[in-house]
Amino acid sequence: MSASRLERRIREAQAAGRPALIPFLTAGFPTPERFWDELEALDAAGADIIEVGVPFSDPVADGPVVAAASQRALESGVTLRWIMDGLAARKARLRAGLVLMGYLNPFMQYGFERFVTDAADAGVAGCIIPDLPLDEDADLRALLAARGMDLIALVGPNTGEGRMREYAAVASGYVYVVSVMGTTGVRDGLPVEVADTLARARQCFSIPVALGFGISRPAQLEGLSHPPDAVIFGSALLRHLDAGGDAASFMKAWAER
């Protein structure tokens, strides 16, 4: 099977001797208007892939920063339809691979078949749906694959080898390795078990391995003898934007590491 768009983005970064950079930005944050400016700024500043968060009223896996951003976006009227329309209008000038990350309910309300059609038309390359179990994702995975899109798998410290191999049998794009159990959020360091989780993921998956949850600065990766193929950062970026910073300056610190 040939590499997907998302896998190719990460492999291109590896060929350049660096991990791929994957910022996460909640759709409609800090404001609906500024969101699109910051999305394009991330793209221009060198993001290889951008995860666009779909706001939801009950974000059980999100820490306070992402949850607050989601609530603000909902109060501003942001919907999955709004996201689709905005991405479609900009797809010709966005270089980064686009991933929609959100909880199952908004996608179900939209309708899987209509969602996949509209996502493909908007230039989306993949989806992450944390609360869609592997045992129930076959229909959506097939619909996405038929349009050249990936359904990204998430694994963590408590994912056993058997379960990892089940994910690996159907996974495409990249595998999202959660650094720590619990919710998203900025942390000072990485748990000691991260190296083991990354090593187990590398043994099971042939696609690139991306590390997320609690990643805020390049220095956190220095203690890893085998760093991930891609790095995902969200809460630190959202906090930076909320404090008046801009996406380009945040990306610069990562691009120059």
From Swiss-Prot:
KW Methyltransferase (keyword) present: no
Active site: E51, D62
Any Gene Ontology CC annotation: cytosol
The entry's keywords: Amino-acid biosynthesis, Aromatic amino acid biosynthesis, Lyase, Tryptophan biosynthesis
Entry-linked InterPro entries: Aldolase_TIM, RibuloseP-bd_barrel, Trp_synthase_alpha_AS, Trp_synthase_suA
Pathway in which this enzyme or protein is active: Amino-acid biosynthesis; L-tryptophan biosynthesis; L-tryptophan from chorismate: step 5/5
Quaternary context: Tetramer of two alpha and two beta chains.
Biological role stated in the UniProt entry: The alpha subunit is responsible for the aldol cleavage of indoleglycerol phosphate to indole and glyceraldehyde 3-phosphate.
Stated name of the protein: Tryptophan synthase alpha chain
